[in-house]
Structures are given as structure tokens and as C-alpha cells.
């Protein structure tokens, strides 16, 4: 990684979390994928009580419960990431596995992992002054964002409705999601 201990313990852009805390959160979420898909417990995560009223509060409490040596946490993330990729690759593509908002198929769960890693990479790169340019790989995150709009509407207490999105990709290409006849 190239970071020394001071770098790992520096504040991230995720309020209240160090860069090491962000990596711990990512490690925990990858371990949760493995647990969901395979039923195997690969960490102590399942033994940490679920405390909080929202996903954010639960994640905050889990990070707080497991803070530790940043170099160990980074290796934990690497191990969990490899296990998560293997679990999703080997899963029945039509099966649905429990996840935060609703059961997901492996492809959708993998896309959520891309989105979470992208968002948290920004939390890490920005405070370190590392350039993190947008690329057309963001299309997966755009797809996920459109796909989860009904969930977002529901959380806000609004009735989900079809929405058409037309986005300009970093390359200048146009990405479209939804029915063009739906409101934009």
C-alpha cells in the first residue's frame, strides 16, 4: 500500500473514520459477502452484536468494535476481498443471497461491492491527495444507482416510480437507463 502508520491513521473523507477505519469497514463488508453467499464465518464479525437503528449506525459500531493495527486490517481486507470474489464467482448465478436491503443475485452483489469500493476509494484518495479519475467503469455504479432508485424512494417515504436517466460518461458516450417515456 505504501502508507506508513501515520498515513493509515490519518482522517479519511468519511466523517469520524481514519483511512484504516475505511479499510476495516471494507474488510467487514467483504466478510459479510462471504458469510451471506457461503454460510462460512471467516471473521469475528458475526459475533459482534448488531447495534444501531440504521445500516450506517450498525457499520459505525462494528468498525468501532474492531479497530486495530492498520497493517493487519489491510491484510484482512486483502484476504476478505479474495474470498468474496471467489464466493461470488462460484455462486449459483440465479440464487439470491441476503444483503442489507434485499436478497441479491451474485452479479448484483458484485456490483454493490464495486460501488462501495469506488465510493470509499474516494474517501481515501482525496485526503491523501491521490488523483482518482473517473472512467467508463463507472457504468456499473450508474446501473446500480438507477436500479436501486425504488429502494431510495421507499426510504424517503415516496412511492417508487419509473425514471429515465441519461448520463454522459467520462469518455463522452451516453448511458441510458429506464424507459425513455418515463419522467427524467
Model-derived features: where do they sit?
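Short, conserved, surface-exposed binding loops centered on an aromatic residue
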Residues: 153-159, 166-167
Amino acid at each position: 500500500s505504501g502508507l506508513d502508520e501515520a498515513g493509515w491513521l490519518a482522517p479519511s473523507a468519511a466523517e469520524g473514520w481514519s483511512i484504516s477505519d475505511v479499510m476495516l469497514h471494507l474488510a467487514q463488508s467483504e466478510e459479510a459477502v462471504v458469510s451471506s453467499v457461503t454460510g462460512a464465518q471467516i471473521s469475528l464479525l458475526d459475533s459482534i452484536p448488531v447495534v444501531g437503528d440504521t445500516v450506517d449506525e450498525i457499520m459505525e459500531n462494528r468498525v468501532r468494535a474492531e479497530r486495530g493495527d492498520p497493517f493487519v486490517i489491510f491484510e484482512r481486507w486483502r484476504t476478505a476481498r479474495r474470498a468474496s470474489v471467489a464466493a461470488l464467482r462460484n455462486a449459483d448465478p440465479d440464487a439470491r443471497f441476503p444483503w442489507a436491503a434485499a436478497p441479491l443475485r451474485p452479479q448484483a452483489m458484485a456490483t454493490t461491492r464495486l460501488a462501495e469500493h469506488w465510493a470509499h476509494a474516494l474517501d481515501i484518495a482525496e485526503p491523501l491527495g491521490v488523483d482518482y479519475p473517473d472512467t467508463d467503469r463507472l457504468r456499473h455504479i450508474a446501473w446500480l444507482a438507477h436500479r436501486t432508485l425504488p429502494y431510495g424512494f421507499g426510504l424517503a417515504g415516496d412511492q417508487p416510480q419509473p425514471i429515465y436517466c441519461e448520463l454522459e460518461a467520462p469518455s463522452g458516450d451516453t448511458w441510458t437507463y429506464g424507459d425513455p417515456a418515463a419522467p427524467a
